[in-house]
Amino acid sequence: AFELTQTPSSVEAAVGGTVTIKCQSSQSIGTYLAWYZZKPGQPPKLLIYRASTLASGVSSRFKGSGSGTEFTLTISGVECADAATYYCQGTYYZSASFGGGTEVVVKG
């Protein structure tokens, strides 16, 4: 098994600002990392897969980067609608793991 450590657990952002979320893996997983957005009462939404590929229909304000053990999700031009909890999810051989989540609070 492997672990994903996500930081910070919570972050406050101003509208128009930038948010950076980090995800560190205990094993090198290449680019097998995805990012999800979760809002209350809604299923998780895939934002990024293979570390940096934007999922269909997702705003280019979301950017994924990294490989191996260090990954980053950057949200630029933060909007009120970005208030949510964000998770990284990695795959290592047959095993999958999620980070602990980052709550993004948007102040307008």
Curated annotation (Swiss-Prot):
Region spans: Framework-4: 98-107
What segment(s) does the record annotate as region Framework-2?
35-49
Q: Span of the secretion signal?
A: none
Coiled-coil regions listed in the entry: none
Q: Where is this region: Complementarity-determining-1?
A: 24-34
Q: What are its GO cellular component terms? A: immunoglobulin complex
Keywords of this entry: Adaptive immunity, Immunity, Immunoglobulin
State the InterPro entries in the record: Ig-like_dom, Ig-like_dom_sf, Ig-like_fold, Ig_sub, Ig_V-set, IgV_Light_Chain
Q: Where is this region: Framework-1?
A: 1-23
GO terms, biological process: adaptive immune response
Give the region (Framework-3) as residue ranges.
57-88
Region Complementarity-determining-3, as annotated, extends over 89-97
What residue spans carry the region label Complementarity-determining-2?
Answer: 50-56
Recite the other comments.
Answer: This chain was obtained from antibody to Micrococcus lysodeikticus cell wall and was isolated from the serum of a single rabbit.
Q: State the name under which the record lists this protein.
A: Ig kappa chain V region 120
Q: Which organism is it from?
A: Oryctolagus cuniculus (Rabbit)
